[in-house]
Amino acid sequence: MALQDDKPGSAPKERSGRQIRSSAARLAAVQALYVLDLAEDARVDQVVLDFMSGSMGGMAIVEVADPEGIFDPTEEIAALEPPDGELFAMLVRGAHAELARLDEVIGASLSADWPWDRLEPVVRAVLRAGVYELLERQRTPPRVAIKEYVDIAAAFYSGAEPGMVNAVLDRVARSARPEAFGGGV
């Protein structure tokens, strides 16, 4: 089992294997959507197959701290946890099939400070996967989905991007699933 900090200053809590595979599926889906966004000739079924077979994805550059704290951290390539294949494929195929609708929802949820043309490809991929999951996967609690995608954004960006991802996904979730936030149905 892996540990995850729930809140700053709180004790880490154990995550189940299923939760870890779901998180890995979300990260892999963001990576796959990024590939599909940038590679005009990429086919969604081939990208899904490449990720599931391990020929794409599955690795990350991680920072490793010096145990004595004398030297700067070093970077190493590490294997990622295997993703939940069903969730991964559903997110990639679904988001890719619904790009126009997702982009419209995202565009309507952006603030004036973050117009569509300011979004980098990684941010677009994070938002597309997150919005698709919020709209189409009712069994995922919205707060869980939002946290997962904000964490993914934070893995790529140290600036304002994770906060923007949080704001957009929160707006979408509150509109699409108000009952999860104490709103009416």
Swiss-Prot record:
<dbReference type="InterPro" id="IPR035926">
    <property type="entry name" value="NusB-like_sf"/>
</dbReference>
<dbReference type="GO" id="GO:0005829">
    <property type="term" value="C:cytosol"/>
</dbReference>
<keyword id="KW-0805">Transcription regulation</keyword>
<comment type="similarity">
    <text>Belongs to the NusB family.</text>
</comment>
<dbReference type="Pfam" id="PF01029">
    <property type="entry name" value="NusB"/>
</dbReference>
<dbReference type="GO" id="GO:0003723">
    <property type="term" value="F:RNA binding"/>
</dbReference>
<dbReference type="InterPro" id="IPR011605">
    <property type="entry name" value="NusB_fam"/>
</dbReference>
<comment type="function">
    <text>Involved in transcription antitermination. Required for transcription of ribosomal RNA (rRNA) genes. Binds specifically to the boxA antiterminator sequence of the ribosomal RNA (rrn) operons.</text>
</comment>
<dbReference type="GO" id="GO:0006353">
    <property type="term" value="P:DNA-templated transcription termination"/>
</dbReference>
<keyword id="KW-0804">Transcription</keyword>
<keyword id="KW-0889">Transcription antitermination</keyword>
<dbReference type="GO" id="GO:0031564">
    <property type="term" value="P:transcription antitermination"/>
</dbReference>
<dbReference type="InterPro" id="IPR006027">
    <property type="entry name" value="NusB_RsmB_TIM44"/>
</dbReference>
<protein>
    <recommendedName>
        <fullName>Transcription antitermination protein NusB</fullName>
    </recommendedName>
</protein>
<keyword id="KW-0694">RNA-binding</keyword>
